[in-house]
Amino acid sequence: MIRGAVYRVDLGEARRGHEQRGRRYGLVVSPTDMALSVATIVPTSTQAQPAVFRPEIELGGVHTRFLVDQLRSIDVRFVHDEPAFFLHRDELEEVEVAVARYLGL
């Protein structure tokens, strides 16, 4: 897994409230150099409501919200294929600031 890369992920089909589910893009925020069995990701949505902790970044010409409020770790078996997109340094920093703000760090 590459930190700052956006992969296709499968968040499962469990219906629990407003949690994102199904197949979508997810940004890997866990460290690249740690070979773990889970990856920490920020799920994305093209339809989510705006919020200070949901930065909007264009992916492949589509305005996409990064749902920092739904940050989670998933088994690496549910991270599919090669990266679909790579965030630029300033875009990744925008997500990191949103994570810090959301977690009160």
Region spans (language model):
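Conserved functional hotspots at enzyme active or ligand-binding sites that engage polyanionic ligands
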Residues: 1-105
